[in-house]
Amino acid sequence: MAAVKKEGGALSEAMSLEGDEWELSKENVQPLRQGRIMSTLQGALAQESACNNTLQQQKRAFEYEIRFYTGNDPLDVWDRYISWTEQNYPQGGKESNMSTLLERAVEALQGEKRYYSDPRFLNLWLKLGRLCNEPLDMYSYLHNQGIGVSLAQFYISWAEEYEARENFRKADAIFQEGIQQKAEPLERLQSQHRQFQARVSRQTLLALEKEEEEEVFESSVPQRSTLAELKSKGKKTARAPIIRVGGALKAPSQNRGLQNPFPQQMQNNSRITVFDENADEASTAELSKPTVQPWIAPPMPRAKENELQAGPWNTGRSLEHRPRGNTASLIAVPAVLPSFTPYVEETARQPVMTPCKIEPSINHILSTRKPGKEEGDPLQRVQSHQQASEEKKEKMMYCKEKIYAGVGEFSFEEIRAEVFRKKLKEQREAELLTSAEKRAEMQKQIEEMEKKLKEIQTTQQERTGDQQEETMPTKETTKLQIASESQKIPGMTLSSSVCQVNCCARETSLAENIWQEQPHSKGPSVPFSIFDEFLLSEKKNKSPPADPPRVLAQRRPLAVLKTSESITSNEDVSPDVCDEFTGIEPLSEDAIITGFRNVTICPNPEDTCDFARAARFVSTPFHEIMSLKDLPSDPERLLPEEDLDVKTSEDQQTACGTIYSQTLSIKKLSPIIEDSREATHSSGFSGSSASVASTSSIKCLQIPEKLELTNETSENPTQSPWCSQYRRQLLKSLPELSASAELCIEDRPMPKLEIEKEIELGNEDYCIKREYLICEDYKLFWVAPRNSAELTVIKVSSQPVPWDFYINLKLKERLNEDFDHFCSCYQYQDGCIVWHQYINCFTLQDLLQHSEYITHEITVLIIYNLLTIVEMLHKAEIVHGDLSPRCLILRNRIHDPYDCNKNNQALKIVDFSYSVDLRVQLDVFTLSGFRTVQILEGQKILANCSSPYQVDLFGIADLAHLLLFKEHLQVFWDGSFWKLSQNISELKDGELWNKFFVRILNANDEATVSVLGELAAEMNGVFDTTFQSHLNKALWKVGKLTSPGALLFQ
């Protein structure tokens, strides 16, 4: 109990202290209409240094936010700042700096037309008007500028100002103007107008009653006659008679002193009067005797000082209220100051000050005003600032408004830091944009190179097939016999004519080899396998062949000998395509030193062109020597790479007279073709002349006419999922596709399609009404059955690949009953036709051409349906890739506007040309093949797209942006989220669209099925009764456009 009492005593003591503090400071607190927060008021009145530091920090935070604000609503910062100042500076004055804050706010937001109808901006002006010398001028200025003319508060405050000046006629005119302008809220304005009329009527009645009372009072009091004759009285001294009435009459109590009337003796010219004490007492008693008179009105209570009405001091004041006494008592006696200073001891106790101490560091109430500062009207300063800003021609070279604006000044370093951060941010964004553009350009180049590579590979495969069908002789080769008269002389060199023939043959073969290898060099690089020496252990243990002279010491073969027939079939290629080094001067020193160009038979490693050509022949770091029996036994012989000195026939052995014997060994050389004779194993002459003689003792050579590069190590590049050949191979491996009842395969060419002609699909004839869409690989036609006006859609493809039918079949298989789209496919030799059953022909592209029918309700319905459709596609692991308006058909919900249970049946997809089945197509591919990515090319958000599923999310966002703003998607990065460049707040139900775009653009690595389901559920919550009624009206108008007759005549 004692503890409870102690706590209660402490609490009451604290409350008493707060009450004392409030009682000492309440007369300095300015009242607010909306009231004050008590906790903030107590902290503001505490007058502590810690509280003051907190206020200064908060004020500096507001100033910093105002200077470097980058959002879309700067008025919000000013509104919060001024509201905070009103609450934390209850005493007002110079310390709050309210007038300067309001001037800065209205000057900063003066050019923002969007705030002219904002109640917050009008509130700033009204607060500034209370500080102006002439508030009416401020209201006239606002009315001329069009600020707040659509708000009721503007007219209410304006009329109150006129009412305070008792100009009721003008105030009523202001109310009437506001009602005529239909200011919002109109009900509040009308209510204030009625209250104003009631107040004016009450004041008028009171004034009439007061005038009647004054007239009755004046009639009962004697009146002074106008222009009365004033006759003088007396013989010697003429005196004018005095006629006084009303309050000018002399009171009886005033007969004393100097104003007493003269006695009778003085009137009878008696000069000496003897004082009679008794007579004076009797007269005094008679005069002082009170007389009973009735009260005309009850006395006014004069103890209450706050109930008196202010008025003039010199009228209407009766003599009874004047101070009594002689005139001597009315003379002010000046105070006489002593000529000395009284002594005060130092130990004397000083008088106690009040508990509310004013800290001089916080309150500057008694500080002197700066002499150079002039006090002007805030409205005039705002107007002059506006005029100066319009006429301003000079440009400050530093951020003057950021340094000197507000209470606290910012240093140049802080301003430079902010400018540097801003430039750095812009520079990073520019770098990201540049890198994205370079990446897109490189990707485009890679795609073009892959396309060229596919064409070249297709051509090579066709040529290889043709060559394998032809029968070629096994030993049909062209031999070049070199006849020389100096056969007996071993040191004789080759003639120049023979060298020229051999050189021409070699250059022709090399040109063809490089032409065949060049397309492969442009494709994606395939890493070569590292050579493993342990894999050759079995080959090392093999015994050497029985016929050593027939062993060829050579590396791994890199060229294939072709027959003359195959050579002649390839000679129609233009020579400028064959070799990229044609016409290039090789960098050789022979022409400089000897004066002529050295022509060699073998590749010269010192020749730059030969070196570049040979670099393409290199595969692995090391090559082993293969024997003849290890070579393939096909009619095409393998040519050694560099050892041309080896004898290859018995005639050569007889001509040269020497048979070289060598052992089977493994030779390891570098990948660069070295200029050495390690593989020749010539006779061991040590002299240079001997080596020259040995190498030049070639009598006859076997030189092929053409060389063809082998493709043993080449691998197939990554197939594109949109390639028709790849899709054809994929569909051939699916037996369930051909077994489907909806697929009809006909072994004949596709019939020719013409407008107003009939085509047979199944067992029915259809008439082609219109060619709706023409694309690169397919067309869309509107057809109708014979003797019927019901239109439907067929898709005609130029490739015999029923990809759309395959996607529909997989959706039906994986989604079961959730997918209700029916279509049939007719496959021909040179194309296929997909017939979509039970759908309309009116696409979303047609609806966009009639933008006046696209209301908010229609947009919500279309996006909701699109979210549900794409959610089903992603559940089936299928990415559409082209959610454009041309492939979206309006269906049942549009034609049956009053069936509210079919809100998810408003759209249907009829084109799956860019779709990818991720369950089957497992190869890695680039996202640039999707049409959605091609449409949004250049957007930075595509650089963060890591999953194919996100492409459909961007497609939905782009379609919603197209419906709302009639243009494709434009986004920007604000530091944390991707947002639209357009202003969403101006749209109807802008909060819903803001959440939609932020969520769908920032899905990142989340599962797209959950994101789509969440957005669809949020969209579905909008379909209430009011929304459905508006939607039905809009659908009824759209239904007129979707009729078959209206479609055909568009």
Curated annotation (Swiss-Prot):
Kinase activity stimulated by CENPE. InterPro entries: Bub1/Mad3, Kinase-like_dom_sf, Mad3/Bub1_I. It catalyses: L-seryl-[protein] + ATP = O-phospho-L-seryl-[protein] + ADP + H(+); L-threonyl-[protein] + ATP = O-phospho-L-threonyl-[protein] + ADP + H(+). The record marks 579-580, 610-611 as: Cleavage. One of its GO terms (biological process) is metaphase/anaphase transition of mitotic cell cycle. Residues 62-226 form the BUB1 N-terminal domain. The active site is at 882 (proton acceptor). Highly expressed in thymus followed by spleen. Preferentially expressed in tissues with a high mitotic index. A motif (D-box) lies at residues 224-232. SUPFAM superfamilies: Protein kinase-like (PK-like) (SSF56112). Induction: Induced during mitosis. Changing residue 159 to W: Loss of interaction with KNL1. Its main location: cytoplasm. GO terms for molecular function: ATP binding; protein kinase activity; protein serine kinase activity; protein serine/threonine kinase activity. The keyword Metal-binding does not apply. Disulfide bonds: none annotated. It is found in: Cytoplasm; Nucleus; Chromosome, Centromere, Kinetochore; Cytoplasm, Cytoskeleton, Microtubule organizing center, Centrosome. Residues 766-1050 form the Protein kinase domain. A motif (Nuclear localization signal) lies at residues 111-118. The modification Phosphoserine is found at residues 367, 435, 543, 665, 670, 676, 697, 1043. It is linked to Defects in BUB1B are associated with tumor formation. Premature chromatid separation trait: Consists of separate and splayed chromatids with discernible centromeres and involves all or most chromosomes of a metaphase. It is found in up to 2% of metaphases in cultured lymphocytes from approximately 40% of normal individuals. When PCS is present in 5% or more of cells, it is known as the heterozygous PCS trait and has no obvious phenotypic effect, although some have reported decreased fertility. Inheritance is autosomal dominant. Essential component of the mitotic checkpoint. Required for normal mitosis progression. The mitotic checkpoint delays anaphase until all chromosomes are properly attached to the mitotic spindle. One of its checkpoint functions is to inhibit the activity of the anaphase-promoting complex/cyclosome (APC/C) by blocking the binding of CDC20 to APC/C, independently of its kinase activity. The other is to monitor kinetochore activities that depend on the kinetochore motor CENPE. Required for kinetochore localization of CENPE. This is Mitotic checkpoint serine/threonine-protein kinase BUB1 beta. It comes from Homo sapiens.
